[in-house]
């Protein structure tokens, strides 16, 4: 599901306000269902839709005009600037607008629609025009969208108040060294007096020029503008001109418009009656009088269909073939345009649309011809809308050339003959809405957007094919239309596509989708060719060495092909030489490997284009499946140069012995031979024992040949003679022939006699089969010899056994039997039999050979259709026995109820069925039987029915329902009498047939057709056979139902959750249903009509077999409604309906049975119990204990069931949506009844207890009097405490509500002080070490510098040897003296040393991690402990690796929310008192750092003198009167130097704080001086309250004096007078500040005096009773933790959401994260670890806990800041929450849990779901190839290769080589690869070289 990200904050360049900016949302998650992944940018507000888009052709910046905003984006759609343009208070009726003069109209907050967005390249500015204030424009600086000018004080500045986008277009024309001109066309919405529809305006280079946007020429007689005449608007009230596109070409400016036609003298007041025409308007660039105005209609046609409604257009150059078709050059301009069909409904155009092309040269030629004809006096000016009448052309002898710009006659000029374009492509379904084109490799490539959010890619070749669509891409999953503006990136590799709410960057090609050369080169994409040795489809420039022969194939004939000889071998042939011929291959001299599928790979011998390979050995030959005689696999050639398989062909292994019959053997596709006498198939003919027994062709196989059908009557003894071919003569020792028959599963073997090689006979035998329901049984049989050698039966000959009597009980059925059976009717025995079995001599045996044979005694058994109308036409079906043997026998002898009924030949079934059609009955005929004769009407051939046929008169009474939707599909029921009579019925609604559904005697049901005449009533007519039933009924067609809203817009995968559908006319649907389609499968569920506007539905399941993952949110491919026949709602696009995963439950207990005590709640644990959907809808759970429901309470992970009062064992069932789940059973055990001894004991004990209670009561009464006074005293204390608790809670609540707004507005988001890369890396790698050797050049004492450097370069070679480096690290880790600190140090040194070779470092790191995982699992450690602690070099290297590769991500994305969180914590802490000694604060997230008593304080504003310029305004600084002087200094420094990095600021300890009282009197304030209060052994630090500093006092920070001085003796000042600052005391004798005495040495060490600030140390017992009282029940103050947490919540959320998102401001997820997570998944797969918790934990330990937690706790690693102790404590709480969010363990909390855990208890489940989704999203991203990763690592290495000194790092690493040299050399000598590379020797060389120098 698409999830919208919050918009981060940034400064906006608009001078009027600062706004919140959007984060770019980059889609890298997989679309559901095949959705491509593109960079996207979304609107920050759903209602602020995008309007225009343009791309700067120099910088590649993307500018987007939207409602209320103009955005500047980078090429990859990362936002840079958002410029606010609205909303503002306005009213369209205010003219001039209220920004010029006050307006009396009612003002409302009005959106500003961007209508024009043009780049003025020569002046580096952007022209943006909106709809506010009558359509004023702004000129914005391109770099930062700073407003250069916003002209608005003249009427020329108001372009149009139309607030609809797509109605205005502008073209900037600029001549060298001159001011520019802006040609602008706009719709005016009837305000023709205020706004011209077309004008040219001045565009001075100076933005402040008073002539800005003035008309180029404006006088009383002639102007550079055209207005719509009021007469035209009087004639056509909705007349307006919509400007769709504009451009400059040659010396002209062109506009493409759509406008209504204006018929002469006919007024049109309805917009629906308008006919629109699309026109080309041309003006000369240098024609301020507009004399050159020419307007011609244009469009195109195909197959007689006219396309006249312009939708979009684009000017481009033609490709070679298109230029040739137009007879122009490739440098000429061609206009590509999209039109919709017809000329009506411009604002709702038809889907039928066309892409057409117009050469500008052809347009100019037609305009020239129009001008010439008019100047010859032919016809009229034909511009009715502007001239109002027919104006005759004036003849003038004026030469008109290609550059003619008009005179003051014959202008403005129109025309009626359209400019016809070449139709390239049409579609009738998905209307095309936008177009863009460019030329690639000589081809015109056209990109067309559609109304359903798809992008068509079309190659425009010109005739005869026109345009060929070669690809279609789904850009917008929500199916919203693509808007007109599309633009290419400057490198033309991407196309920017825009919908109302999304800008998308789509690659112009996606060649990589084609995986074979054939697919690639037959795709039709001109960008794509086949990169042969890399086996990929790509552009030519992405294919390495594409210029070399056959490296890059551009046509399908150039594809590399492979032929192998032989193409197949037997499975028994091993290691055979195969000859492979490679056609069209590049140079293969680098080497080839032959791969046989995944079985084996061998070296190939290359000779030119021939390769010799050896087939697999016996161990590698594939096993052939039992039912096959061959197995094919891919024989692939792998290039050793690229490592890629670049060509393959099928190679087959065959097995002849799989064939059991001769024909299948010799007809096999392989070289198989049949051994006739051994009855086996073999690939080796030499294995046949007899030469003459070897068969190679099918003609030589022993086989049965076709003969006449073998018919055997059951019980008859008969031989079976068969024809054959090549029957073998059994050899000595071999048995003879047999016939084997399989009769109903029983095998019958009959001896057979071979007459010769072509004849065999099964001996005499009789055969039987069971049952009289089978008249003819086909029996499989085979001829075998020698026991089981089968003779082939290629024609599948069968023996047919039959019984004459079976299913032939009557004469008719008997004689109807096929004559081949020779069956006949034995009259005497009344049975069907063979002639020889009819033994009765007196009765004849009838068969077809008998003369004039007829069956007597016909019978009618049933009549179907027993009633009908007297008008006739009813078809009556008669079933019976002996109903004739030929149609002629019954053709004229059927009557029904006395009325002739005509039999129908086509319906006649011999002897069994007659169907006849009734004639017209005479008046008065009512009923009667059916009578018929067979041939002749003699008694023995006549019969009549027992059933009666009745004549009835059908009638209709009513109709239900009486209305239905226009699209039809309504089930209409017509009630009446005798409606079930007759054989057919027809119902008509108007002139259309109502589709028959069913009927009975009282009603007819049919389905209404779509209306052919629109809405309204239609008559209902009914016909029954030939009877027309009178009816006055009417059926009304009404508007189809419409759906407006679905609530909620979600369900779970199993569906069946309730949905409420709101819309119109919903009650006309009889059986509404709701449907979804997902992965090609459809699911439907039922709805119920509530009323005309409301339905209730049950959500369909996603699919019956869908099993979503725990974190999967799916969007169906289609969502809609089955509403009768309403097709428009089958797919409903106005919804974002999504499916959440099904809830899952754990078992109640491992055994499945949970023991419960009565009344105890049952807790069901699970996941996904509460889908995180917005709105109030929740899942409705029903829990049954047995059959009894229980009350349910639901949370995210558990379901609490209050059980009914039951005992015994009961099954628990959970119902939710369409799910039913049983987590087990509960066994409720009641307490057992008490025994008699127990009851006696309890009674005795109770008596004793009662006596004791009486005694205690007497004592208590006496004592209670004494306690009354104490109780009253305690009550007073409790009342006092209660009021203080209430006050504290009230304050905490008020803070919680107000502080978030205050904090958000206070924070300054400018200038984040990022550390440079080197400092950042050092703080992460070597924390606490500021000046590390790796930052300096290597320094060697003495003269050995060169030798040491030489030795270290040798060491560098060793370090770059993977075998050495791995052995080195493993050896160090085995040493006991190699401490944890050493491990971290070595890991950091290695990473700094390999900074320039990160590919190699990554390879080593992966190997170390793989070893670590192996070791972890071998030691039987729990897999979740992996990477938990830094106990190995690999773990620290992993941290450093992420530190290197995530630096860019930190700066561009994650750094901002982290810095904002730090600032928020710091600022929030400083808003309340902070104890300077203990670090405790009023506002804190940490319980340990919370002041737990009431501190009275006031906020003061101090005015600080600007230290840089004392004459500039003073800087106000917020402080607290309880702050110490040092705290005040730090706050002042923060305010004065707020945008200065901490390291560049002065330190508070180096500055003095002066309090200035007047111009001369200055007092230096200090934490400790002679005025400091000392009480007993406690000394309190001085605060502003102590000095009685008042609000708005003036202070200054001055550098600290080098030496203090004492107060002069002459000024005998008492201590009290200083502390009170009497007004009488002013020291004016010196310009220096008066300094209090220098602070004393901390007295704790000298005299036992303890210093305090706000609270004394809690452990001291000398506090006053009042102090202790103020701290009693300190937990009260924990509510402040909650207040602080609420204040900071948004900043924590922002940080977590950024870190747990795969989409970040347009930048992809850092490759390092995806690459490392995939590596961990691979390792889990390798070790068969399928536990998702383990995988989750590995990833959490790897990145969040290893890197992010470190950064969160230590923001000073990333930023140049100071982190105080209270800030550190709060960050630690956030970091702990972050760690808890990544954990998979259950979050169990109780009243004794730490407060920081309780603080975020409710948030952590949500954060956990973010983490799970984050990991799942990463897993779905496409894998990063090693090639892409290495390229990325190489780039990172290049960027930072010189940050650290390599030799210094190596020198530091060498110290470990030196320390453990013996162990290292020993390990190298034991390693085989190290021995082969003589690494131990090289180490000894290194040690010797370094030792010499030392």
UniProtKB/Swiss-Prot annotation:
Query: What is the membrane topology noted in the UniProt record heading this document?
Result: Single-pass type I membrane protein
Q: Which UniProt keywords apply?
A: Cell membrane, Coiled coil, Disulfide bond, Glycoprotein, Membrane, Phosphoprotein, Repeat, Signal, Transmembrane, Transmembrane helix
Q: Name one GO biological process term.
A: pharyngeal system development
Domain IPT/TIG: start-end pairs? 858-951, 954-1037, 1041-1139, 1143-1228
Chief localization: membrane
Q: What does this protein do?
A: Coreceptor for SEMA3A and SEMA6A. Necessary for signaling by SEMA6A and class 3 semaphorins and subsequent remodeling of the cytoskeleton. Plays a role in axon guidance, invasive growth and cell migration. Class 3 semaphorins bind to a complex composed of a neuropilin and a plexin. The plexin modulates the affinity of the complex for specific semaphorins, and its cytoplasmic domain is required for the activation of down-stream signaling events in the cytoplasm.
Put simply, this protein is called: Plexin-A2
Natural source organism: Homo sapiens (Human)
Q: Lineage of the source organism? A: Eukaryota, Metazoa, Chordata, Craniata, Vertebrata
């Amino acid at each position: 599901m698409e999830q919208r990200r919050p918009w981060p904050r940034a400064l906006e360049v608009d001078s009027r306000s600062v706004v919140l900016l959007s984060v770019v949302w980059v889609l890298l998650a997989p679309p559901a269902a095949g959705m491509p992944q593109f960079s996207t940018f979304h609107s920050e507000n759903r209602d602020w839709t995008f309007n225009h888009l343009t791309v700067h052709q120099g910088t590649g910046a993307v500018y987007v005009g939207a409602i209320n905003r103009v955005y500047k984006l980078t090429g990859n759609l990362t936002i840079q600037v958002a410029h606010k343009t609205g909303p503002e208070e306005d009213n369209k009726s205010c003219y001039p607008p209220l920004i010029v003069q006050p307006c009396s109209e009612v003002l409302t907050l009005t959106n500003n629609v961007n209508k024009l967005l043009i780049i003025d390249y020569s002046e580096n500015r952007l022209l943006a025009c909106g709809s506010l204030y009558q359509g004023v424009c702004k000129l914005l600086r391109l770099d930062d969208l700073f407003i250069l000018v916003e002209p608005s004080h003249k009427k020329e500045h108001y372009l149009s108040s139309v607030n609809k986008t797509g109605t205005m277009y502008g073209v900037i024309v600029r001549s060298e060294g001159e001011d520019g001109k802006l040609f602008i066309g706009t719709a005016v919405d009837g305000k023709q007096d205020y706004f011209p529809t077309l004008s040219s305006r001045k565009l001075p280079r100076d933005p402040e020029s008073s002539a800005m946007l003035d008309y180029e020429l404006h006088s009383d007689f002639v102007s550079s503008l055209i207005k719509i005449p009021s007469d035209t608007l009087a004639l056509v009230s909705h007349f307006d001109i919509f400007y769709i596109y504009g451009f400059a070409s040659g010396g002209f400016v062109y506009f493409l418009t759509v406008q209504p036609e204006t018929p002469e003298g006919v007024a049109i007041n309805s917009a629906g009656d308008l006919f629109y025409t699309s026109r080309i308007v041309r003006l000369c660039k240098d024609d301020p009088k507009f004399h050159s105005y020419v307007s011609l209609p244009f469009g195109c046609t195909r197959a007689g269909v006219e396309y006249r409604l312009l939708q979009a257009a684009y000017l481009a150059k033609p490709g070679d073939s298109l230029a040739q078709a137009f007879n122009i050059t490739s440098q000429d301009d061609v206009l590509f345009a999209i039109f919709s069909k017809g000329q009506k409904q411009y604002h709702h155009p038809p889907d039928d649309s066309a892409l057409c092309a117009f050469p500008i040269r052809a347009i100019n030629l037609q305009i020239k011809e129009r001008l010439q004809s008019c100047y010859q006096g032919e016809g009229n000016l034909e511009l009715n809308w502007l001239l109002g009448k027919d104006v005759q052309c004036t003849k003038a002898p004026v030469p008109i050339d290609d550059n003619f710009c008009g005179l003051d006659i014959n202008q403005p000029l129109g025309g009626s003959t359209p400019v016809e374009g070449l139709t390239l492509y049409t579609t009738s379904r998905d209307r095309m809405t936008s177009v863009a084109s460019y030329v690639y490799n000589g081809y015109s490539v056209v990109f067309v957007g559609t109304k359903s959010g798809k992008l068509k890619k079309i190659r425009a070749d010109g005739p005869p094919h026109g345009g060929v669509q070669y690809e279609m891409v789904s850009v917008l999953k929500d199916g919203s239309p693509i808007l007109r503006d599309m633009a290419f990136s400057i490198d033309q590799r991407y196309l920017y596509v825009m919908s109302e709410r999304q800008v998308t960057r789509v690659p112009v090609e996606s060649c990589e989708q084609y995986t074979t050369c054939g697919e690639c080169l037959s795709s039709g994409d001109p960008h794509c060719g086949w990169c042969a040795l890399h086996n990929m489809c790509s552009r030519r420039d992405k294919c390495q060495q594409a210029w070399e022969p056959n490296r890059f194939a551009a046509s399908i004939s150039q594809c590399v092909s492979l032929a192998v000889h032989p193409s197949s071998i037997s499975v028994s042939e091993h290691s055979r030489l195969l000859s492979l011929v490679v056609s069209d291959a590049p140079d293969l001299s680098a080497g080839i490997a032959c791969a046989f599928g995944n079985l084996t790979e061998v070296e190939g011998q290359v000779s030119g284009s021939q390769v010799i390979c050896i087939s697999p050995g016996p161990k590698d030959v594939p096993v052939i499946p039992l039912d096959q005689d061959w197995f094919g696999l891919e024989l692939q050639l792998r290039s050793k140069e690229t490592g890629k398989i670049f060509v393959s062909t099928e190679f087959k292994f065959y097995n002849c012995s799989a064939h059991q019959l001769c024909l299948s053997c010799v007809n096999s596709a392989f070289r198989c031979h049949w051994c006739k006498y051994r009855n086996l198939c073999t690939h080796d003919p030499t294995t046949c024992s007899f030469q003459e027994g070897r068969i190679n062709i099918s003609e030589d196989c022993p086989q049965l040949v076709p003969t006449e059908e073998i018919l055997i009557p059951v019980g008859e003894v008969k031989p079976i003679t068969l024809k054959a071919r090549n029957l073998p003569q059994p050899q000595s020792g071999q048995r003879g022939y047999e016939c084997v028959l399989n009769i109903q599963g029983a095998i019958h073997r009959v001896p057979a006699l071979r007459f010769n090689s072509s004849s065999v006979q099964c001996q005499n035998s009789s055969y039987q089969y069971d049952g009289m329901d089978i008249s003819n049984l086909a029996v499989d049989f085979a001829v075998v010899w020698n026991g089981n050698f089968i003779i082939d039966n290629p024609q599948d000959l069968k023996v047919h056994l039959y019984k004459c009597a079976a299913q032939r009980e009557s004469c008719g059925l008997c004689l109807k039997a096929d004559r081949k059976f020779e069956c006949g009717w034995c009259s005497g025995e009344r049975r069907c039999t063979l002639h020889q079995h009819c033994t009765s001599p007196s009765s004849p045996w009838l068969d077809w050979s008998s003369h004039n044979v007829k069956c007597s005694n016909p019978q009618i058994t049933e009549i179907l259709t027993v009633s009908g109308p007297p008008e006739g036409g009813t078809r009556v079906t008669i079933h019976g026995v002996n109903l004739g043997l030929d149609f002629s026998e019954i053709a004229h002898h059927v009557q029904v109820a006395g009325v002739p009924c005509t039999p129908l030949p086509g319906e006649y079934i011999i002897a069994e069925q007659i169907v006849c059609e009734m004639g017209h009955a005479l008046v008065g005929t009512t009923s009667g039987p059916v009578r018929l004769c067979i041939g002749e009407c003699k008694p023995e051939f006549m019969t009549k029915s027992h059933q009666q046929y009745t004549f009835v008169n059908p009638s209709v009474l009513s109709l239900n329902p009486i209305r239905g939707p226009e699209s039809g599909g309504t089930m209409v029921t017509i009630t009446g009498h005798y409606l079930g009579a007759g054989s057919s019925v027809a119902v008509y609604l108007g002139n259309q047939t109502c589709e028959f559904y069913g009927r009975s005697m009282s009603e007819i049901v049919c389905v209404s057709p779509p209306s052919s005449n629109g809405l309204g009533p239609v008559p209902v007519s009914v016909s029954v056979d030939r009877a027309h039933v009178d009816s006055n009924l009417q059926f009304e067609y009404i508007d189809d139902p419409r759906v407006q809203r679905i609530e909620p817009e979600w369900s779970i995968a199993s569906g069946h959750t309730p949905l409420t559908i709101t819309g119109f006319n919903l009650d006309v649907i009889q059986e509404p249903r709701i449907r979804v389609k997902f992965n090609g499968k459809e699911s439907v569920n039922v709805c119920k009509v509530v009323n005309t506007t409301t339905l209730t539905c049950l959500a369909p399941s996603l699919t019956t077999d869908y099993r979503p993952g725990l974190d999967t949110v799916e969007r169906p491919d289609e969502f809609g409604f089955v509403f009768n026949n309403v097709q428009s709602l089958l797919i409903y696009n106005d919804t974002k309906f999504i499916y959440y995963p099904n809830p899952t439950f754990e078992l109640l207990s491992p055994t499945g049975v949970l023991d419960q005590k009565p009344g105890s709640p049952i807790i069901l644990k699970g996941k996904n119990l509460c889908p995180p959907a917005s709105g109030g809808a929740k899942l409705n759970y029903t829990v049954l204990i047995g059959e009894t429901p229980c009350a349910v309470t639901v949370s995210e992970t558990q379901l609490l069931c209050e059980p009914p009062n039951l005992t015994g064992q009961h099954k628990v069932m959970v119902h939710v949506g369409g799910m039913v789940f049983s987590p087990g059973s509960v066994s409720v055990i009641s307490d057992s009844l008490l025994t008699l001894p127990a009851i006696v004991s309890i009674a005795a004990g109770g008596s004793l207890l009662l006596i004791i209670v009486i005694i205690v009561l007497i004592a208590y009464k006496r004592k209670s009097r004494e306690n009354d006074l104490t109780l009253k005293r305690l009550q007073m204390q409790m009342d006092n405490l209660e009021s203080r608790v209430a006050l504290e809670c009230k304050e905490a609540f008020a803070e919680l509500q107000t502080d978030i707004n205050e904090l958000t507005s206070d924070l300054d988001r400018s200038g984040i002080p990022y550390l440079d890369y080197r400092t950042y890396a050092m703080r992460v790698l070597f924390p606490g070490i500021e000046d590390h050797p790796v930052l300096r050049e290597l320094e060697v004492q003495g003269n050995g510098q060169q030798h040491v450097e030489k030795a270290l370069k040798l060491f560098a070679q060793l370090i770059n040897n993977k075998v050495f480096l791995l052995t080195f690290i493993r050896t160090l880790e085995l040493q006991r003296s190699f401490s944890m600190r050493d491990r971290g140090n070595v890991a950091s040194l290695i990473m700094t040393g390999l900074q320039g070779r990160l590919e190699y470092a990554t390879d080593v790191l992966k190997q170390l991690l793989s070893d670590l995982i192996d070791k972890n699992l071998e030691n039987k450690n729990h897999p979740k402990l992996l990477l938990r602690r830094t106990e190995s070099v690999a773990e620290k290297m992993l941290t450093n690796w992420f530190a290197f590769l995530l630096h860019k991500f930190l700066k561009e994305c994650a750094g901002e929310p982290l810095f904002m969180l730090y600032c928020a914590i710091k600022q929030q802490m400083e808003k309340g008192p902070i104890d300077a000694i203990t670090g405790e604060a009023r506002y804190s997230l940490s319980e340990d750092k919370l002041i737990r008593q009431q501190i009275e304080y006031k906020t003061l504003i101090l005015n600080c003198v600007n230290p840089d310029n004392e004459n500039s305004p003073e800087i106000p600084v917020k402080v607290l009167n309880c702050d110490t002087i040092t705290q005040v200094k730090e706050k002042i420094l923060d305010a004065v130097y707020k945008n200065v990095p901490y390291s560049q600021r002065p330190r508070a300890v180096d500055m003095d704080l002066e309090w200035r009282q007047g111009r001369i009197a200055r007092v230096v304030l200090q934490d400790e001086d002679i005025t400091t209060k000392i009480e007993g052994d406690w000394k309190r630090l001085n605060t502003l309250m102590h000095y009685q500093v008042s609000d708005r006092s003036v202070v200054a920070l001055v550098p600290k004096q080098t030496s203090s001085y004492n107060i002069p003796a002459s000024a005998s000042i008492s201590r009290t007078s200083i502390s009170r600052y009497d007004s009488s005391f002013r020291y004016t004798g010196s310009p220096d500040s008066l300094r209090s005495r220098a602070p004393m040495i901390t007295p704790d060490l000298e005299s036992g005096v303890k210093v305090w600030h706000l609270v004394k140390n809690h452990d001291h017992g000398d506090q006053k009773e009042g102090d202790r009282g103020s701290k009693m029940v300190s937990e009260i103050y924990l509510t402040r933790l909650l207040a602080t947490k609420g204040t900071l919540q948004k900043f924590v959320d922002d940080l977590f959401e950024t870190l747990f998102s795969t989409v970040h401001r347009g930048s992809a997820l850092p490759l390092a994260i995806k690459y490392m997570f995939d590596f961990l998944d691979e390792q889990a797969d390798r070790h068969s670890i399928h536990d998702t918790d383990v995988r989750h934990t590995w990833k959490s330990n790897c990145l969040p806990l290893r890197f992010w937690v470190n950064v969160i706790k230590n923001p000073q690693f990333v930023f140049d800041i100071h982190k105080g102790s209270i800030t550190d404590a709060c960050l630690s709480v956030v970091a702990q929450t972050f760690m808890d969010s990544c954990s998979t363990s259950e979050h169990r909390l109780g009243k004794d849990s730490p407060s920081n855990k309780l603080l975020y208890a409710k948030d952590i489940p949500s954060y956990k779901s973010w983490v799970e989704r984050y990991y799942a999203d990463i897993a779905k991203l496409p894998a990063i190839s090693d090639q892409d990763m290495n390229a990325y690592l190489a780039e990172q290495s290049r960027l930072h290769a010189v940050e650290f000194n390599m030799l210094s790092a190596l020198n530091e690493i060498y110290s470990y080589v030196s320390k453990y040299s013996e162990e290292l050399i020993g390990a190298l000598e034991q390693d085989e690869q190290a021995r082969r590379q003589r690494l131990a020797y090289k180490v000894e060389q290194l040690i010797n070289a370094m030792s010499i120098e030392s």
